């Protein structure tokens, strides 16, 4: 492939594919990937420092915790019965 460097047109076939700068660039690319991978694993509060807030993060920040269960109702439970079944189909009397 032809490219321009310092105002000169150069052909990439004239350079070795294993030149030192390519090897060092590859090494530093791998090193930066590993560092960023472990930073994101260990640092879970990246978004909080930048002003982003999740709606679930801001609900109970004062230590109250979520609300408790509503009080139990006493008396007969009448809402457990479902609707009545539909009538039988056919109706021919066989």
Curated annotation (Swiss-Prot):
Site (Cleavage): 81-82
Membrane-related topology note: Single-pass membrane protein
Entry's Gene Ontology BP terms: calcium ion transport; endoplasmic reticulum calcium ion homeostasis; protein palmitoylation
Compartment(s) where it occurs, according to its Swiss-Prot or TrEMBL record: Endoplasmic reticulum membrane; Cell membrane
A Pfam family matched in the record: SelK_SelG
PTM annotation: Cleaved by CAPN2/m-calpain in resting macrophages but not in activated macrophages. Macrophage activation up-regulates expression of the calpain inhibitor CAST/calpastatin, resulting in inhibition of CAPN2 activity. Truncated SELENOK proteins produced by failed UGA/Sec decoding are ubiquitinated by the CRL2(KLHDC2) complex, which recognizes the diglycine (Gly-Gly) at the C-terminus of truncated SELENOK proteins.
Disordered, as annotated region: 47-94
Keyword line: Calcium, Calcium transport, Cell membrane, Endoplasmic reticulum, Ion transport, Membrane, Selenocysteine, Transmembrane, Transmembrane helix, Transport, Ubl conjugation
Gene Ontology terms: cellular component: endoplasmic reticulum; endoplasmic reticulum membrane; Golgi apparatus; plasma membrane
Residues passing through the membrane, by range: 20-42
Physiological role: Required for Ca(2+) flux in immune cells and plays a role in T-cell proliferation and in T-cell and neutrophil migration. Involved in endoplasmic reticulum-associated degradation (ERAD) of soluble glycosylated proteins. Required for palmitoylation and cell surface expression of CD36 and involved in macrophage uptake of low-density lipoprotein and in foam cell formation. Together with ZDHHC6, required for palmitoylation of ITPR1 in immune cells, leading to regulate ITPR1 stability and function. Plays a role in protection of cells from ER stress-induced apoptosis.
Family that this chain belongs to: Belongs to the selenoprotein K family.
UniProt subunit comment: Interacts with DERL1, DERL2, DERL3 and SELENOS. The SELENOK-SELENOS complex interacts with VCP. Interacts with ZDHHC6.
The protein, known as: Selenoprotein K
Organism of derivation: Chinchilla lanigera (Long-tailed chinchilla)
Upper taxonomic lineage: Eukaryota, Metazoa, Chordata, Craniata, Vertebrata
